[in-house]
Amino acid sequence: MKFIVKLYPEIMMKSKPVRMRFTKMLETNIRNVLKKVDDDAKVQRQWDRIMVMVPKNKPELAQAFGERLACIPGIAHVVQVDEYSFTSVDDIYQQVLPVYRDQIAGKTFCVRVKRTGSHDFNSIEVERYVGGGLNQFTDAIGVRLKNPEVTVNLEIEGDKLYMVTKRIEGLGGFPMATQEDVLSLISGGFDSGVSSYQFIKKGARTHYCFFNLGGAQHEIGVKQVAYHLWKTFGESHKVKFVSVPFEPVVAEILEKIDNGQMGVVLKRMMMRTAARIAERMGIQAIVTGESLGQVSSQTLTNLNVIDRCTDMLILRPLITMDKQDIINECRRIGTEDFAKSMPEYCGVISQKPTVKAVLAKVEAEETKFSEDLIDRIVEQAVAIDIREIAEQMNTRITETETVVAIDTNEVVIDIRAPEEEENKPLEIEGVEIKRIPFFKLATQFADLDKQKTYLLYCERGVMSKLQALYLIEQGYHNVKVYRP
């Protein structure tokens, strides 16, 4: 069993040297991700495709491989195939017949062939021959070239025949690290998660900068979002998560800054700080989730004033997106429920915010800040490898327990993603098991029976510890981590 990875069309349009570099990078990225699923994963680069071989003795890995390939930037689509050898067109037909006889019985069908290599036949001739044979010697209703109920997809390469059993849509975009690094400002809300994802998809190694305005609970929630984005879409490369203690800045804004200017001043202070951090990391651009007109600080006038605080390039991928479109994308990438449970701190800064800030007035207000405020904040910022988020949970989870046995009145919550749970269902005799995906737990936990104790389960124990710590910070103490 194999997967044939088809490159995103924009890659195919590049010059030969660039195309070669992008393809090599994608091959490396795929190998890095799949090796974490199984060390025996084999990846082979060809000119216009990449072959992924499922170990012959481990066919059960096909689903896991397919799920990971669907989340790697730079892939247009993936086809899962079974490989055969052939000597003639009739040999192709004879091998297709037993595979599709039952699948097309009582249905309309068509045959589609893609061919590479030197042969004494073309693709259309194979389609006609195989289609005619299936039509004559099966119980199919007949051939329908437009909108058939079953499409028999075949790929021919040299003397190899590939029967397509499944097609998986890819992310598109460019392979990770083919573009330069960016620093994404992440708050855990709808917008910043989507803007970060957009740059991951575009092939930029996306580091995260979090301005902590709400204490440990806020930081834990945002780390979950960043970790989810990295683990799902950017796992092939290491990135940093930078936490900036921004409460002193907020305190000075509330004490010293004119009420109407607070929102714009806050954003300018964030941009200044992020620019300093980005320069230290050798990064040339900041990414934000701002969308035109969404809030008072995001008018064109105010965005212009905000940009004047730094020479650093500020990128806003969501600038023309509607809020509902952002929420829909948030739902698709799996960060919606995180965002729903995330408090919005910036919105309470100013009671009467200006929508047409004047640069001179804003700069005059900023002279009221302590001279070394930004320096102190930058020095106090903590940067970690995003993989350390999981390790941190092992040391910070002291308020709860990790258990291997289940007592009476304890309920296990399987927090794995639905596809993981379906692939390896958790079954424990005599124990009640609830299935709540981790991205819905924050919003659904309050509805559970408070008289019971809940044991959170995931396969590696990383997300269960993150979720347990988050729930404890919210005031729930009837939660533990289950590690059988």
Curated annotation (Swiss-Prot):
GO terms for biological process: thiamine biosynthetic process; thiamine diphosphate biosynthetic process; thiazole biosynthetic process; tRNA 4-thiouridine biosynthesis. Residues 63-167 form the THUMP domain. The keyword Nucleotide-binding applies. GO terms for cellular component: cytosol. Gene3D superfamilies: 3.30.2130.30, HUPs, Rhodanese-like domain. Pathway: Cofactor biosynthesis; thiamine diphosphate biosynthesis. GO terms for molecular function: ATP binding; CCA tRNA nucleotidyltransferase activity; tRNA binding; tRNA-uracil-4 sulfurtransferase activity. HAMAP family: ThiI. This is tRNA sulfurtransferase.
